[in-house]
Amino acid sequence: MNSVPQNTTIVLVHGAWADGSCWKDVILPLERNGVEAICAPVPLTSLTDDIVALTRVLERTSGPAVLVGHAYGGAVIGAIRDERVKSFVYVAALAPDEGETVAQVFYRDEPHAEAPKLNPDKHGFVWLPVDAFTRAVAHKASNEDTRIMSAVQRPISVQCIQEPAPAPGWKEKPSWFLLAEEDRMINPKTQQFMAARMGAKIRAARVDHSPMYTATNLVVDVILEAACKTLNSVNPSAQVAND
């Protein structure tokens, strides 16, 4: 694998029921490979709000960027049209086309038997029960991790999944897709459909919905591959060292 430019920024976008801490095991391995990694805290209040929040984070960076989205975060990164963004990485993520909603692609195929029912509260936000994290969100993760995931979960507004998506950047720029073959939240068939439609480079693996926790090395490798393939190398002699 080629080296990664020193001024590259990897921007990590969490999905629903999560915050930036879901990338905790990915950040340092990326930085040991010479790239800055930052998390974009999106509010999960509407797709538009989340796009604006990600745009603000991008304004803090300089140089080329690679956007990485997990689950719902894929819809957010796809809406960014900043010229400094060189590629997209989808980690078991959703990638609606222009005019589609997150809900339309999420429910394209039958949900897994262990997938939780998504019912909004009186404020229009969806929370997950505690056991949803051990049964579906990260069924291969440790009990400690799933307990923390449940405790820090942030609800997602129904507006996020009902708002039509704008024209996606993946139609113009290269994308990578980590397809989670044992995903219990987003049907792997749906992931395959989206990845093929995008023309993404697909990395399929027998991982669950949250490989940031359960297959960290794989996630880091896919991100670094996207960065190396789409950005000019500053130091051709440097080697990428996965951790």
Each model region followed by its residue ranges:
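Conserved HGGG/HGGXW glycine-rich cap/lid loop of the alpha/beta-hydrolase fold
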Residues: 5-48, 65-66
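Short, proline-enriched alpha-helix->beta-strand connector loops that line the catalytic pocket
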Residues: 8, 170-175, 197-200
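Conserved acidic catalytic loop of the alpha/beta-hydrolase fold
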Residues: 48-65
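Gly/Ala-rich beta-loop-alpha elbow adjacent to hydrolase catalytic centers
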Residues: 68-73, 77
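Flexible "cap/lid" loop of the alpha/beta hydrolase fold
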Residues: 84-130, 157-160, 164, 194, ...
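Active-site nucleophile elbow and catalytic-triad environment of alpha/beta-hydrolase enzymes
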Residues: 148-169, 181
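Short beta-strand/loop motif that positions the catalytic acidic residue
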Residues: 177-179
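Conserved loop-alpha-helix segment in the C-terminal half of the alpha/beta-hydrolase fold
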Residues: 181-213, 218, 225-226
